[in-house]
């Protein structure tokens, strides 16, 4: 049996890209000695990244015909016509020529709607367009409608659906009527690029960005839902109390950076706030190592990667209270609406005993999640074996 993983994102996509890399590495290891496994990517830049992780990949591009199939997929009349005409797009024909039995889309995507006959594994990271539909990134440009159509048409067809948590799996089942046995919660893991061997040393990184140790660190792209503003409001409160702490934001602009910059200027925070922009993977470990604590008051979840990475590096974590299921006792959990609560949590991180307790709890929580991942991997392998048995029933 042969599986083919499809990677459509690149490093500029943020944390989701690292999770996609983890998914590829995980499936490669599960398939070793059991099944054939290939990786195809739509981004040439991924070839070198994957090679550095000992994964061989090939680049491809969706054809105009493939994109047309994807464009037509929302139309209720299209699929019956496609079946009647036996139309199979170039993407699926290419996969069949390669002997592919099961396609693994390692990021959320509407591309499974291109497939006429091949089975696939889908990925869902969140349902935040339903949880918090007021944010512009899911409210504007028909994103909400596109996600709803994608999930309603793709998920019922999937052989398996990879999610990041039991909470998300339950929400998918409840909202879209998906059978629970089709869903497989697979906990996230820290980014593979955070290993010391592939990272630039802390001193070099801090010098590069002009940072002094002891800042609060938020690795997140500038989306509205990332809630950078609440951190800045907390800085204003702390400054009024005579505590001028600093924060470093690392992430590309997704339309909300100017809003953050305007607030920084209006509240005289330029000396306390560093906007680092997109940071290459090899610098991330050094930025984590140099911080006092990681702060993440995001509205989107139910899980995120920076908490895992804070625990891996051994840093205290301040996290949104609605995602306590991921954090357990390993974070100071605050209401992301409440700047005062966030300021108090940041102030608490000046206490070495509190920080040490959070670091110990983080290490323990990471071990728990790693055990959950091992159990989920065993379940994934069992499901692949079930698919293999069924796949033997046709040529």
Task: Label every PLM stretch briefly.
Residues 1-395:
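Carbohydrate transferase catalytic cores enriched for Leloir-type hexosyltransferases
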């Amino acid at each position: 049996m042969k599986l083919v993983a499809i990677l459509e994102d690149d490093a500029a996509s943020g944390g989701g890209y690292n999770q996609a890399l983890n998914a590829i590495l995980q499936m490669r290891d599960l398939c070793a000695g059991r099944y054939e496994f290939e990786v195809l990517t739509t981004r040439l830049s991924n070839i070198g990244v994957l090679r550095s992780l000992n994964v061989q990949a090939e680049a491809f591009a969706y054809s105009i015909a493939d994109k047309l199939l994807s464009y037509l997929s929302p139309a209720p009349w299209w699929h019956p016509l496609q079946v009647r005409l036996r139309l199979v797009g170039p993407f699926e024909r290419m996969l069949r020529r390669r002997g592919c039995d099961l396609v693994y889309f390692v990021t959320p995507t509407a591309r499974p709607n291109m497939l006429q006959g091949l089975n696939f594994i889908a990925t869902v990271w969140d349902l935040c367009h339903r949880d918090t539909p007021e944010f512009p990134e899911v409210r504007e440009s028909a994103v909400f409608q596109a996600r709803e159509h994608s999930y309603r048409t793709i998920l019922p067809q999937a052989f398996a659906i990879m999610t990041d948590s039991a909470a998300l799996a339950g929400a998918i089942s409840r909202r879209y009527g998906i059978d629970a046995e089709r869903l497989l919660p697979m906990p996230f893991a820290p980014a593979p690029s955070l290993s010391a061997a592939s990272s630039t040393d802390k001193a070099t990184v801090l010098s590069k960005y002009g940072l002094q140790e002891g800042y609060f660190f938020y690795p997140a792209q500038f989306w509205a839902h990332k809630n950078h503003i609440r951190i800045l409001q907390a800085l204003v409160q702390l400054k009024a109390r005579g505590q001028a702490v600093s924060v470093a934001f690392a992430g590309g602009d997704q339309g909300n950076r100017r809003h953050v910059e305007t607030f920084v200027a209006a509240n005289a925070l330029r000396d306390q706030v560093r906007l680092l922009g997109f940071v290459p993977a090899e610098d991330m470990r050094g930025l984590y190592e140099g911080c006092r604590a990681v702060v993440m008051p995001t509205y989107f979840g139910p899980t995120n990667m920076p908490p895992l990475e804070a625990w891996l590096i051994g840093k205290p974590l301040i996290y949104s209270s609605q995602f306590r299921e991921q954090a357990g006792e390993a974070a100071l959990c605050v209401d992301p609406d409440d700047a005062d609560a966030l300021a108090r949590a940041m102030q608490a991180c000046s206490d070495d005993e509190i920080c040490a307790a959070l670091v110990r709890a983080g290490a323990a929580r990471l071990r728990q999640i790693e055990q959950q991942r091992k159990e989920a991997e065993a379940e994934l392998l069992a499901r692949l074996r079930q698919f293999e048995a069924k796949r033997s029933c046709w040529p």
